[in-house]
């Protein structure tokens, strides 16, 4: 019976030009949710809207237009009411916020409304928690996702729990066609025997790929699924057919809960199955890779009877030679490039089949397996018995001239220069060439130290008249650091920095008590003792204390002067022998330096030289500005000040 239309809705439809059709009594209108479930086009539009990615569009505007089109194809506003569209959006958002594992299960049940989805989740929460396994089965190029609940130590309550896959075929297929299906590979009377094999397969914990919620277009492959299960029970299926494989993109889309579930339940169960199928895969390695959030992609090849597995073993103790350390520092080679001469070109996989890990602990032996075929591995052959010494552990760069071997290519290139005479490093100042850059750097320091320097205007820059020798102007090699302001050289950079403060006037050391600044830290330390009132140096004889050690030592010498240098004529004491000898010459009037012209005597030789200029008339100090000469240096300096005052 058709539902009566309200007058208000009827007027609205007539204004919008919508054609009204009267339904007959024998026609029943299906609900919109059921229509959506049965219509594969609507489901496809829904999936296209959910899986749309921004990268599929060329521009942001095109992405927005594409989303509007997909949303319109899914929601169909011309056929649904606002309440129905709102219910679909709420249901989609509810499924999105569910946890990953629970979301996949609820979507597989295809709830028609939000209330039905809530009922499914509440019913699942009331059931006891049991681990589930997800298996991806490849059947003629198609992937079939199946979920199986693992019953730990519990037998099925009835044989009906293991349903015959033949009975789950499409309803349109008759029993006769199912019996004579060529995909089964067995007549109908052999079905009980197949059921026994399938029951044995269930007890051995081999996951049975069942999924009642697969799309309708895949239902035609149920017969292929039965053939697959039959072959699996007979041991004709390899691990690749029942492997749980994830690509890099699929693994990055999983949340931490799904990755933990995959590592705890799927790998622990599936690896056990693989071992039972004679696949020697160590289970902890793959599980540790999964828990470190790295997808494990197995590489399994079909077993070949005529080909022996190429399996190599490499043992490394962790110790490295000196040549090996230099090679690792100078050559940026990956492990794959290093081992390619021995192992050949590896196949391209997401996870390489060969790998070497150098342990930090030299006491532990680290062994890794090499090869591509792991389906028939029963024993490993030592690499040292089948291949020569590894290149990393020996010398493999040979000189073609003399035959000498080197561990690194850079060492060989440097050695070849001895044969060719090549000197690629050239000095830009003098043109001299060197074979090594270190030799050139050492040579350039000589140019920097011997560079000519023009001294300021003082008694040192009087080259024409001053008796300053070239040896005094050229610093020794032991003082390579020169001051750019005055040309003075220093042996250490710290001395140069301390000296430069005399030119800049910098005083980086401040007294926190009075704020006074100093150029050297030692002076600041001495100054701070004034504020603290500390005089740590106390004289043991007279009780006088001193704040500086040098003054304390000078005071100590005064007490010991009687025993050192005491003048017997006047009683004066002297701490130094030179001062005492000069004092004695005064008493004896001894002047060993005598002038041959006038007979005048002098106690010092420099005084005699200066006196002799009065006889010879020599004036060695000449003014470079006016040419006037003087007999003494300080006379010239006093004269030059007159020139500087005139220019200013």
From Swiss-Prot:
It is found in: Nucleus. GO terms for cellular component: chromosome; nuclear body; nucleolus. The keyword Ribonucleoprotein does not apply. Keywords: DNA-binding, Isopeptide bond, Metal-binding, Nucleus, Phosphoprotein, Repeat, Repressor, Transcription, Transcription regulation, Ubl conjugation, Zinc, Zinc-finger. Residues 237-308 form the KRAB domain. There is a cross-link at residues 22, 454, 460, 507, 521 (Glycyl lysine isopeptide (Lys-Gly) (interchain with G-Cter in SUMO2)). InterPro entries: KRAB, KRAB_dom_sf, SCAN_dom, SCAN_sf, Znf_C2H2_sf, Znf_C2H2_type. PROSITE patterns: KRAB, SCAN_BOX, ZINC_FINGER_C2H2_1, ZINC_FINGER_C2H2_2. GO terms for biological process: lipid metabolic process; negative regulation of transcription by RNA polymerase II; regulation of transcription by RNA polymerase II. One of its GO terms (molecular function) is DNA-binding transcription factor activity, RNA polymerase II-specific. Residues 165-182 have a biased composition (Polar residues). Highly expressed in testis. Also expressed in breast carcinoma cell lines. The keyword Oxidoreductase does not apply. It comes from the Eukaryota. Transcriptional repressor that binds to elements found predominantly in genes that participate in lipid metabolism. Among its targets are structural components of lipoprotein particles (apolipoproteins AIV, CIII, and E), enzymes involved in lipid processing (lipoprotein lipase, lecithin cholesteryl ester transferase), transporters involved in lipid homeostasis (ABCA1, ABCG1), and several genes involved in processes related to energy metabolism and vascular disease. This is Zinc finger protein 202. It comes from Homo sapiens.
């Amino acid at each position: 019976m058709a539902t009566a239309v309200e007058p208000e809705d009827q007027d609205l439809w007539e204004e919008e030009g919508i054609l009204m059709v009267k339904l007959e009594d024998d026609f029943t209108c299906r609900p919109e949710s059921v229509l959506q479930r049965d219509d594969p086009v609507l489901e496809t539009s829904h999936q296209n809207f959910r899986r749309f990615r921004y990268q599929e569009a060329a521009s942001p505007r095109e992405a927005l237009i594409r989303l509007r089109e997909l949303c319109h194809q899914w929601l169909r506003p011309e056929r649904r009411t606002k309440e129905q569209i709102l219910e679909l959006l709420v249901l989609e958002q509810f499924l999105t916020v569910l946890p990953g594992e629970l979301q996949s299960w609820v979507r597989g049940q295809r709830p028609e409304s939000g209330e039905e989805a809530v009922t499914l989740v509440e019913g699942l929460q009331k059931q006891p928690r049991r681990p589930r396994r997800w298996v991806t089965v490849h059947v003629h190029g198609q992937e079939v996702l199946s979920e199986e609940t693992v019953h730990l130590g519990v037998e099925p309550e009835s044989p009906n729990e293991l349903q015959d896959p033949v009975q789950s075929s499409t309803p349109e297929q008759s029993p006769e066609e199912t019996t004579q299906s060529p995909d089964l590979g067995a007549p109908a009377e052999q079905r009980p025997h197949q059921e026994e094999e399938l029951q044995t397969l269930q007890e051995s914990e081999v996951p049975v790929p069942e999924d009642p919620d697969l799309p309708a277009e895949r239902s035609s492959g149920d017969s292929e699924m039965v053939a697959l299960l039959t072959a699996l029970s007979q041991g004709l299926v390899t691990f690749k057919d029942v492997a749980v494989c994830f690509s890099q993109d699929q693994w990055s889309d999983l949340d931490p809960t799904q990755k933990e579930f995959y590592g705890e339940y799927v790998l622990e169960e599936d690896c056990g199955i693989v071992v039972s199928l004679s696949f020697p895969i160590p289970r902890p390695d793959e599980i540790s890779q999964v828990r470190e959030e790295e997808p494990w992609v197995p590489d399994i090849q079909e077993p070949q009877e005529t080909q022996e597995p190429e399996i190599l073993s490499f043992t490394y103790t962790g110790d490295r030679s000196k040549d090996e350390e230099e090679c690792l520092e100078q050559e940026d080679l990956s492990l794959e490039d290093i081992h390619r001469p021995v192992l050949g070109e590896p196949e391209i996989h997401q996870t390489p089949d060969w790998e070497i890990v150098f342990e930090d602990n030299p006491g532990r032996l680290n062994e890794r397996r090499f090869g591509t075929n792991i389906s028939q591995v029963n024993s490993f052959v030592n690499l040292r018995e089948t291949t020569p010494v590894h290149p990393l552990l020996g010398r493999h760069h040979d000189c073609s001239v003399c035959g000498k071997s080197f561990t690194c290519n850079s060492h060989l290139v440097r050695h070849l220069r001895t044969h060719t005479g090549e000197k690629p490093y050239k000095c830009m100042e003098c043109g001299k060439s060197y074979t090594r850059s270190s030799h050139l750097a050492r040579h350039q320091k000589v140019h920097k130290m011997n560079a000519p320097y023009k001294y300021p205007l003082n008694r040192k820059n009087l080259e024409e008249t001053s008796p300053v020798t070239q040896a005094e102007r050229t610093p020794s090699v032991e003082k390579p650091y020169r001051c750019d302001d005055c040309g003075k050289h220093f042996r250490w950079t710290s001395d140069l920095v301390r000296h430069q403060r005399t030119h800049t006037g910098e005083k980086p050391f401040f007294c926190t008590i009075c704020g006074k600044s100093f150029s050297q830290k030692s002076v600041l330390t001495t100054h701070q003792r004034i504020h603290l009132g500390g005089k740590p140096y106390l004289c043991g004889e007279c009780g006088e204390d001193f704040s500086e050690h040098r003054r304390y030592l000078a005071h100590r010498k005064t007490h010991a002067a009687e025993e050192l240098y005491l003048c017997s004529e006047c009683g004066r004491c002297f701490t130094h022998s030179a001062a005492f000898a000069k004092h004695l010459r005064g008493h004896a009037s001894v002047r060993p330096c005598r002038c041959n012209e006038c007979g005048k005597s002098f106690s010092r030789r420099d005084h005699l030289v200066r006196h002799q200029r009065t006889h010879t008339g020599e004036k060695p100090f000449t003014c470079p500005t006016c040419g006037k000469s003087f007999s003494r240096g300080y006379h010239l300096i006093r004269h030059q000040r007159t020139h500087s005052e005139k220019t200013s």
